[in-house]
Amino acid sequence: MTFDDKMKPANDEPDQKSCGKKPKGLHLLSSPWWFPAAMTLVILCLVLSVTLIVQWTQLRQVSDLLKQYQANLTQQDRILEGQMLAQQKAENTSQESKKELKGKIDTLTQKLNEKSKEQEELLQKNQNLQEALQRAANSSEESQRELKGKIDTITRKLDEKSKEQEELLQMIQNLQEALQRAANSSEESQRELKGKIDTLTLKLNEKSKEQEELLQKNQNLQEALQRAANFSGPCPQDWLWHKENCYLFHGPFSWEKNRQTCQSLGGQLLQINGADDLTFILQAISHTTSPFWIGLHRKKPGQPWLWENGTPLNFQFFKTRGVSLQLYSSGNCAYLQDGAVFAENCILIAFSICQKKTNHLQI
């Protein structure tokens, strides 16, 4: 045995133990069942892959649906939160509105009570006015009947005068014709006829003048009858009538503002000239305790009390009470209340009584 032979690897030598035996791997490949098993395994892998793909796709769809559902929930939460805020705001607004409405109700209730009181006063004034209008209506009807009788009489006289004038005109015409026929007659006859013509002409002129006067009287009476038909009474609407004066209760304003209002209505603040006037006014305001300015004032303490027209106060009818000794820049002004006359600062607010002369029907 050479050195090279000794150096050969031991595995080059045949394995005695493996002689006569086939390898196990080769034995499996040579088995008739390995191909169907492999195909089955491949199919299972494909099915599993497809299933995984489908499941993954469905999972993505479910994930998208969950995201959309989450977004919808978020949106609904925002909407719900907005609704809750709006409801809270509405409740707060409702509370404020309730408070505001309650305040308005209280104010309206107070105004309603004031209006009810004013309505009672207006009802009394309306009753007094209706009585005054009834008296004026009775007076107006009598005046109209009287005027109608006068107009009928004048119209009848006018017709008579017109008839007389026509007769005179006819006589003049006849005389002129006779004068024309007698133009060739004697001068004496002409003078006689001319004298008669002059006399008749003079009478005609007198009758014409009387007729014009009657026409003017007729026109004046017709105008008076028209005024009587339109005459609603000696006092304007809402004014009270007492003897020769009309009275209006209005306000409330300061003394100066009431004075200006009375002047704009053609009158002045109340001036009491007699006990009868004072009794009427006190009776007219006996249903209320409100103060009423009258046209009596003075500039400074110690100076005389003067009416609006400058005449001094006659203490025979009444005296002022509760006169303040304090000096006001606007002076002291008098007012009626509870049947007495008081004096106070002229800038205070009170009702007033306007006064003006009655407007009698002129015939």
Swiss-Prot record:
InterPro entries in the record: C-type_lectin-like, C-type_lectin-like/link_sf, CTDL_fold, NKR-like_CTLD, OxLDL_rcpt1-like
Segments passing through the bilayer: 32-54
UniProt-annotated stretches for the region Neck: 55-241
SMART domains recorded: CLECT (SM00034)
GO BP term, pick one: cell adhesion
Lipid attachment in record (S-palmitoyl cysteine): C45
Cytoplasmic topological intervals: 1-31
Compositionally biased tracts (Basic and acidic residues): 1-18
The protein's name in its UniProt record: Oxidized low-density lipoprotein receptor 1
Domain notes: The cytoplasmic region is required for subcellular sorting on the cell surface. The C-type lectin domain mediates the recognition and binding of oxLDL.
PTM characteristics: N-glycosylated.
PANTHER family, sorted: OXIDIZED LOW-DENSITY LIPOPROTEIN RECEPTOR 1 (PTHR47298:SF1)
Annotated gene: Olr1
Signal sequence coordinates: none
Organism whose genome encodes this protein: Mus musculus
Keywords: Cell adhesion, Cell membrane, Coiled coil, Disulfide bond, Glycoprotein, Immunity, Inflammatory response, Lectin, Lipoprotein, Membrane, Palmitate, Receptor, Repeat, Secreted, Signal-anchor, Transmembrane, Transmembrane helix
Sequence ranges of the Sequence repeats: 96-141, 142-187, 188-233
Extracellular membrane side: 55-363
GO CC entries: extracellular region; extrinsic component of plasma membrane; membrane raft; receptor complex
Localization of this protein: Cell membrane; Membrane raft; Secreted
Disulfide cysteine pairs (residue numbers): C235-C246, C262-C354, C333-C346
GO molecular function terms attached to this record: carbohydrate binding; low-density lipoprotein particle receptor activity
Record-annotated C-type lectin domain positions: 242-355
Region (Disordered), start-end ranges: 1-22
Subunit structure: Homodimer; disulfide-linked. May form a hexamer composed of 3 homodimers. Interacts with HSP70.
Coiled coil, from the record: 57-232
Membrane topology: Lipid-anchor; Single-pass type II membrane protein
